Amino acid sequence: MSGAIARAKEILAENPGSWMPQQFENPANPAAHYAATGPEIWSDCGGKIDLFVAGVGTGGTLSGVAKYLKEKNPAVQIVAVEPADSPLLSGGTAGPHKLQGIGANFIPATLDRSCVDQVIPVTDQDAGETARSCAAREGILIGISGGAALFAALSLSANPENAGKRIVVLLPDSGERYLSSWLFAE
């Protein structure tokens, strides 16, 4: 990701009058999710949420939604999902992984780590198998990062201490863009 950001900055410098949203550092990113995504989730669930699970790419979605949900109910548990092969949030080191959309190999400035109650690292294999299973069994075509988030949510739901709890998982994209990738190559 660092290389892509560096290249974007080069293009910005070469094109006077252009603008770069800088989604990894722009406070408008989490603010948008605080203003829209968080309230939508709260409303759709009738305020009954025990755990919220989302992958961490820019950190904006997780941070904005978490801030909103915790203001409504401080007991809501916020669960961040990261690649097992690049577990920076868990205190590990950056590394290559296949979970496009999460695990930028640095901790984004837009991520408010104080709102995260738990971090679940997910392997490429578990994310891929979960995304494929979701498509085959449920008819819902989700992407790689969605597979990781769903794997984490399913793992949480299997924990006896979470029996009867409402777990909300954010599935950020469709699997259409991954149809020709390793995700659906099998």
Where are the predicted features?
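Surface-exposed amphipathic alpha-helices with a cationic face
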Residues: 66-73, 157
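Beta-strand segments within the central parallel beta-sheet cores of soluble alpha/beta enzyme folds
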Residues: 50-53, 77-84, 165-172
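Small/polar-residue-rich loop-to-helix segments that shape phosphate-bearing ligand pockets
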Residues: 1-51, 82-135
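Short glycine/serine/threonine-rich phosphate/pyrophosphate-binding segments
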Residues: 55-66, 145-153, 178
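Terminal helix/beta-alpha structural elements that buttress the NAD(P)+-binding lobe
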Residues: 51, 76, 81, 140-142, ...
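Structural signature of the thiamine diphosphate
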Residues: 6-8, 15-23, 142, 150-166
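Phosphate-binding loop/pocket of nucleotide- and phosphate-handling active sites
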Residues: 154-186
